[in-house]
Amino acid sequence: MFCVQCEQTIRTPAGNGCSYAQGMCGKTAETSDLQDLLIAALQGLSAWAVKAREYGIINHDVDNFAPRAFFSTLTNVNFDSPRIVGYAREAIALREALKAQCLSVDANAHCDNPMADLQLVSDDLGDLQRQAAEFTPNKDKAAIGENILGLRLLCLYGLKGAAAYMEHAHVLGQYDNDIYAQYHKIMAWLGTWPADMNALLECAMEIGQMNFKVMSILDAGETTKYGHPTPTQVNVKATEGKCILISGHDLKDLYNLLEQTEGTGVNVYTHGEMLPAHGYPELRKFKHLVGNYGSGWQNQQVEFARFPGPIVMTSNCIIDPTVGSYDDRIWTRSIVGWPGVSHLEGDDFGPVIAQAQQMAGFPYSEIPHIITVGFGRQTLLGAADTLIDLVSREKLRHIFLVGGCDGARGERNYFTDFATSVPDDCLILTLACGKYRFNKLEFGDIEGLPRLVDAGQCNDAYSAIILAVTLAEKLGCGVNDLPLSLVLSWFEQKAIVILLTLLSLGVKNIVTGPTAPGFFTPDLLAILNEKFGLRSVTTVEEDMKQLLSA
């Protein structure tokens, strides 16, 4: 086992990465190794997808499957080894079908990619784990060095984050052939184990640019189906009655659950990254969507144990449900998996609803605590002139985007302290689950404009980017000249691709933490600092002083 893709990876003087019987996320060595094997199979599939496009062949089954299966290897998504192997078998079957399509056009069609003809050696998980050793990401580290390995992983993990957003967009009916062609090209190239530093740096920027397009179609999918988010008050306390909790990012799953629970007497609560759903008109119209429950994903083993109803996980992040003994009432959807946990194959939430009706639910309603979400793209753009006016009248000094992933490290208190230290004449824009570090605190307003503005999920970084570009255009300056600073927390691969997106768009002087990714070497950090001004957090006082004086 070797895995260094998330922020909580093991770090020692001898090197970084989880390499024992179990990773810090709870992933076993078996599952981790089989995920490496799956990635190799997916690289072979993408190699043939690239070849097929040369013949004018576009196989939508391949396009739909490939990012979804890659998403299953993202941190805290799928811990179920047999399902990972199932994805690998499906990848190979699709590859062979695509290969046959190519051969039907050109009898001499061939693919030089080293992953193009990969076959699984056995049905036995032990045999497959041994085969997976051929594809351990750091197997040639001694030959290529830490810097090349780090850049490879930056590209692989960044592309994995983009694949997750591609799957979210696909679920909402969005498709862009250019994006899929670019995805397959990059995935296939990574299967050649590239070792050219400049080419890898260029690839990282290409992934960032591609992901901007992915976030654009995801935004289109969400707003077309569910309307544009508008500021909405959300109760974060319990309401009397039977209940279901839904977590993750998949708004379609939430919509289906709300439709199927309507009139049943079962209330629905959002959790984690599902919180922004309350801002969408077509979702909040359901009166039994009563509120948001819990805090950051890392606290779920305590909070889920206390929730008196079933829980549905639609995407990341799931962690061991046996710790809180709620594994008999947690359900996984789509690419999510945990051994022994019930999995919903289709869109029928009937079994979950039946379980909710058999459980006690909340015995009484707590005193409400209201927070505001729903500052989506249209709302943000509608406030652009107000922001410019406040800046021109020196009522608004600076905007801080403080957001990103949450996690368990104590150092993440930095982001709470930073938010509460922001001066009263400054505004905080936030998104993703890092907001749970401070989103239930009171920040007041500036002439009626809330000082804390929740822009949505991690992918809603797209809205923040569009706002920044709009402000720059109206002020006749560049984005980097705005009174705007980005202070970002990271944990997993979606955050990595958001960072690559920002860098590829030329955004500079981003401050990130609580630690640097384990696959970033000192040399890579120096390169990113020199090219983009990217740096790690220090202390709240020093960072605040530097950002306000920039």
Swiss-Prot record:
The membrane spanning regions, by residue number, are none
- Please give the cofactor(s) recorded in the UniProt entry for this protein: [2Fe-2S] cluster; hybrid [4Fe-2O-2S] cluster
Record's keyword terms, sorted? 2Fe-2S, Cytoplasm, Iron, Iron-sulfur, Metal-binding, Oxidoreductase
In Swiss-Prot or TrEMBL terms, this protein is called Hydroxylamine reductase
Gene3D superfamilies, per database record: 1.20.1270.20, 3.40.50.2030
**Record's Gene Ontology CC terms?**
cytoplasm
Task: State the function annotated in the UniProt record.
Answer: Catalyzes the reduction of hydroxylamine to form NH(3) and H(2)O.
Protein family membership: Belongs to the HCP family.
Domain of life according to the entry: Bacteria
- Main location per UniProt? cytoplasm
Q: Which GO terms describe its biological process?
A: nitric oxide catabolic process; response to hydrogen peroxide
Q: Which residues carry this modification: Cysteine persulfide?
A: 405
User: What sort of enzyme, by top EC class, is this?
Assistant: oxidoreductase
Q: Name one Pfam family in it.
A: Prismane
Q: What is its EC number?
A: 1.7.99.1
- What does the entry list as the binding residues for hybrid [4Fe-2O-2S] cluster? 249, 273, 317, 405, 433, 458, 492, 494
Q: Which gene encodes it?
A: hcp
Free-text cofactor note: Binds 1 [2Fe-2S] cluster.
Q: State the reactions this protein catalyses.
A: A + NH4(+) + H2O = hydroxylamine + AH2 + H(+)
InterPro entries assigned: HCP/CODH, Hydroxylam_reduct, Prismane-like_a/b-sand, Prismane-like_sf, Prismane_a-bundle
Presence of keyword Repeat: no
Compartment(s) where it occurs, according to its Swiss-Prot or TrEMBL record: Cytoplasm
Q: What residues bind [2Fe-2S] cluster, as annotated? A: 3, 6, 18, 25
Listed GO molecular functions?
2 iron, 2 sulfur cluster binding; hydroxylamine reductase activity; metal ion binding; peroxidase activity
